[in-house]
Amino acid sequence: MGHRWSRLLVFLLAAVILSAAGIGQVKEAGRFGRLQEDTVKTGAFRRQTLDDGMQDMIRDMEDPGELLGIYWLETGFGEQPFSGNCTEQAFESMGRSWKRRPYWNVYAEACRVIWDDLVYFPIPVSKDGDAEEISFVDSWMYERNYGGTRGHEGTDIMAGENVRGYYPVVSMTDGYVTHKGWLEQGGYRLGITAPGGAYFYYAHLDSYAEIEEGDPVKAGDLLGFMGDTGYSKKEGTMGMFPVHLHVGIYLIHDGEEISVNPYQPLKYLENRRIECVYGRKN
């Protein structure tokens, strides 16, 4: 009888261990399942969700893209709290398992392309000491209705004073001018392709600096001035909405243009504002 109970206990213990191992394997498989061939096309990736702790960690980093890529995979793209230590050494350790997975290189490159070329916030501060107030919120995929219902693929930086042609707009990155001119929705706009390949879109400008398509730009170069142009097929239309700058960021993945949420990149840059002499308010 004693031997029978002993064998039964051993069997039950083994079953518990195997069950726990199986659950662990299922969880691990689910975790690694976050990294797929089309991960960068998903809404979860495109939202670019970050908590305040991660923003604090990357604030002084020059090339945060790969680290953020690991963070998103570990947290289900910000859906789960991050349980690790916010140190570069901890992320290096966590990254080892991800770097062995299929599709890591393509995914990590997308993260670097979005983040590693960022240098300056697009609205400078005034050299004369005046507090030129601006504000922005996370309005990613908020409903917009001009030309049909759609999601808002960008972030609007709102002018503290509703004065067109007053707030300078500078390039967030190095790069070259890919597009310049009028768009029905975007008004006067510029598109800058950064060295890594991301496309930075600046819309509703009042006017342009002396800049043309094909010109090289450096981060901090003047692109133009904030305005309220757009929402019309007629070039030059103004006043359909308050003065603001619409910022968009786009990737090219498998030949497809993919928008990503600029809000967290702008938060990362909000203390990196160059000084500039503002003109008179008209």
What are the functions of these language-model segments?
Residues 1-14:
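N-terminal Sec-pathway targeting helices
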Residues 18-33:
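Membrane-interface motif at the C-terminal end of an N-terminal transmembrane signal
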Residues 28, 41-53, 67-188, 219, ...:
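Surface-exposed, glycine-biased beta-strand/turn segments
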Residues 155-157, 218-219, 223-226, 244-250:
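Active-site scaffold segments
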Residues 170-207, 234-243:
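Zn2+-dependent peptidoglycan hydrolase active-site motif and core
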Residues 189-190, 217-235:
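Short hydrophobic beta/alpha edge segments that flank linear recognition/processing sites
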Residues 238-282:
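Acidic, glycine-rich catalytic/binding loops that coordinate metals and/or anionic ligands
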